[in-house]
Amino acid sequence: MKLHTLVLPLVALAPFVALRGGEAPKHVTNSLGMQLVRIEPGTFTMGQDGPPLEDYLGQKRFKELYRATDQIDFDEKPAHRVTITRPFLMGVTEVTVAQYRQFDLTFKASDAKSKPAEDDAASGVTWLKAVEFCEWLSKKEGKTYRLPTEAEWEYACRAGTTTLFNTGDTLPDAQQKWFGDENLRVAYFPPGPMPQEYDWRKAGEKAMAGLKYGELVGGSWTHENARHDAAGSLRVAQKTPNAWGLHDMHGNLAEWCSDWYGPYESGAQTDPLGRVDGDFRVFRGGFHSSLIRFLRSANRGSRVPYDAFDRMGFRVVQGELPKGTLLPKAPPPLNAQNVSQTVPRIVPQPANVPFFAGPKLLVHVADDAVGPVYCSENHCMTITECPNGDLLAAWVSTPAETDLTCSHAASRLRFGAKEWEPASPFYDAADVLDGAPQLWWDGDKTLYHLDNVYYKSGCQSLRHSTDNGATWSKPEFFRAAGDYANQLMRTKDGVLAIPYDLFEVMVSEDGGKSWQQHGRRMRGSEDVRPGNSGSFIAGYHPAMVELADGRWMAFSRLDPVPEQARFENRTPVSYSSDHGKTWQWDMSEFPVVSSAQKSVLLRLKEGPLLFCSFTDQWRDWRNRKGLVFKSTVGDYTGYGLFAAVSYDEGKTWPDRRLITPGGAERKWITKERTPFLISDTLAEPVSYLTATQSRDGNIQLVTSRNHYAFNLAWVKAPAPAPKK
C-alpha cells in the first residue's frame, strides 16, 4: 500500500465501509460495540521546537500565562521526523464506562459522587489496568489489542496537520471543559467569563462587580449542576472529530500510551517505542480543567503506572506492536553522577565552639531557565545527609506554584566541597502538579524519597537508595491522593511518622514496610482553637518531634486572619499521646507565620529541641514588629529568620538568635528571587524551611534558596552588639 500522511475526512461513527479492491475496512465495530478507525502509515514531524515558555512569574505577568497557547515544554524538543510503517486500528473514542464494565463489572458501581454515565470516558484507570483491559480484550476476540505508542498517538492526533492542535492554532469555542478545580481556575483567569476556548458557565455583571483578579466568580459547581449542564460530563464524541475521525484527542481525559517516558533524541526515527525502562508511562492529549497549552498535539505528560488519577483514561489500538527500536535509559542527571561510595570518618566539631556559615546559595539555576529546571520559582525544600557525607537537597521547580509545568530538582553539596552544584532534574513526572518532596536517611545505608503531588492530583510514591542517591529503587505505591507530606520523624522505639497538611499522620511501626493512617482530615465545621482537640494537627505545614514522655508535638503555620485570632496570632502547637490519632491544640510563644513561610522543628543530637521560624508574617513585613534577642551589650530587636532552643521539652525557649551573618546592611535574594536586606538586625524574611543535623554536629538549615550551617553553641551565644 502506498505510504501517505493524509486521508480524506471520515464520519467517525459511520457504519462499516469496505474499501475497493478487497482492502481492509476503514471502520470496524468490535465485540464491545467499540468503533475503531483504520490509520494508514505515513511520516510526520513529532514534537515542537518552540517558542519556549516565558518567565511569567519573574516578569510579574503570571495572569497572562493562560494566553501562552503556543509555548512549549522542554521535553517536546527536538522536533524530529517519524515514520509509521504499518497501519493500525484506533478507537474512535476513549474507552467508555459501558465498555470498561464488560471487563470489570464493579467499575465505579458504588461511586455515588461521580455516578458516571455509560457513555462517559472511563476515568481513574491506571496504566496497569489499561494494559490488563487490552490483554483481556485480545484474548476475548483473538486479536491483538494494546495501548498506542506515543508516536502512533501523536501521528493519529495530528491527522496530517502541523499546527498546534488538529483544529489549527487554537481550539474551537467551548472545546475545553472546566469543572474540576475552582482554586486553579481563579489562580489563572481574571474575573468574568473564561476565554472562548473554555466551557464554563458565565457570570453576570452583578456577580463580577468589585471582584479582583484571583477571586472566585459564581461559586463552585455541584455535581448535579455540572451534569445537568453537561459541563461536568466526560461523555465521549461530543465535539467535532479530527480529519481521521478521532474524537476527544484534545481534552476530556488524558490518555495512556505504551511508552516509558524519557527525553527525545534528534534524527529521523522509524516506529519508535520510547525508552527501554523508566519510572513513568507517557500520557497524551491533556485533560479537562487545565490550560489549553497542555492539550496541544505535541504536549507530553507522564505518571507512575499505578496512578489512578481521576483525569486519566485510555483508548485502544488493534494491531501488532511495531518492530521498532527501544532507546536506552536516559543518562543520569548531575545530582546522580559520579557519586562517591566511600563512607568518611567524620569527627564532630567541639560542642562548645560556636560555628556559623551562610547564607550560601543553594539554588543554582540560570536566569533564563525554562526546563527541566526553572528560574521562576524554586520552593518546598528537603535536605538530608548521605552516608558518604554529601548533603542532598531536592525541591519543586516551576514557572508558578499552580502550574502543571512543574518539576522536582536536586543538588549536591559533595563532601569536602565549598559550593552546591548546579540544579539538575530529580525524580519527576511530566505535567503533574508536584508538591514538596521529602528526603530522609535512616542513619545506616538507606535513603528514603517520598514523592509528593498536589492534593487530588495523583498518588504518592516511595523510593529507596542504598548507594547515596546514585540510583533509586522503582517507585512503589505509598498512598492514594493526599495533601502535602512534611518532614519524616523517627521515634525512640523506631516508629516512622509523616504529618500531612490538614490531614492525618502516616505511621509505620515496622521500619517502613507498611503504613497506616492515624487521624483524619480537618472538616470545615470544626472549632480549631487552643483548649480544643480533634483528629488532626491544628494548622498546616506541620513540623513534628517526639517529646521525652512519648507524646508527639507539632508546630504549624496558619493563614486565615480569623483563625489566627483564635490563637492570639501565635504559632499553633498540637500534642498527641496516641501516635497521631487525636490531638490537643494549644498555642506557642512564637509569632504565627502564614503564606510563603514554613517553620522547622528538630530534636538535636545533644538533646534540646530546635525551632526555626520567622519573627513576622511575610504579608506584614512592611509593618514588622520583630522579636527581642540577646547581644553582648544587651537586648535588641531583630527581624526575620531566627532559631530558638528549648531544654525542657518545649515549655520554654530561653536561647534565641537571629540567623544572619551580621555586618553592614546589604542585599541578598530569597524565595522567587525576592531581594531582602541582611544585617545585624535583619535576616531572611520569607521561605519554606527544612533542616537536618549532620554527623559533624552542625545544623544544616535550608530556605527556598539559601543554605545556613550553625551549631548549638552558636545559637546559645549572644550576638555581637548590633551596629547602629
What is each residue range found by the language model?
Residues 45, 54, 58-72, 110, ...:
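Functional-site microenvironments in short loops/helix caps that host divalent-cation chemistry
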Residues 328-724:
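Asp-box/BNR beta-propeller blade signature and adjacent active/binding-site loops
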Residues 1-5:
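Positively charged n-region of N-terminal signal peptides that target proteins for export
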Residues 28-110, 126-128, 251, 320:
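A short glycine-rich, aromatic-capped structural motif
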Residues 271-275, 301-308, 631-632, 679-680, ...:
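Short proline/glycine-enriched turn/loop segments at secondary-structure junctions
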Residues 309-323:
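Short, structured beta-strand segments at or near domain termini in extracellular proteins/domains
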Residues 7-15:
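Bacterial N-terminal signal peptides
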